Amino acid sequence: KRIWLLADEVYARLIFDRPHAPSFLEIASPEDPVIAFNSFSKSWSMTGWRLGWLTAPPSMGEIFEKLNEYNISGPTTFVQHAAIVAIRDGEDFVRETVEGYRRGRDLVYQRLSGMKRVHLAFPEAAFYAFFRVDGVDDSLALARRILDQTGVGLAPGAAFGQSGEGYLRLCFAATPDTLSDAMDRLEPELN
């Protein structure tokens, strides 16, 4: 039996300290059981436009063509035109976006690292800090309390599965002023 590898590469362009994110496609042969999914959502800030692509073995082309034709039909015209512009002219936008996320990451990492109850790894990609908070056994309750008391929205780690319990996720895709303000509000809660 063949085991299929489904690779989510939606955040692959949002990497900070390497030239590019590793991909199974770099080592797979064309007919290997690997399907990589990608999207315009993250790299080109087209979230909600529902446009992406996949890379799959050529022998599966007809299968995906039928799925698309009968289940999806096709994306609206303006979204297709936007995707063409993103591919043709969007590299500067991606670079600037990644640089902004890098600044946000650095600010958030520096501030969270100084909070006594917080333990986190240095984020290498995307725009999230996923951190453990000492003494927490209900991340949803903590996220709700922090939202109620500080106005800062965090995702509870439990939303990502049982092993995420005790963690929180913070998005640093925001301006430095917004992030600094959020860190100021979080500090009393996480110290």
Predicted regions: what is each one?
Residues K1-N191:
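PLP-dependent class I/II
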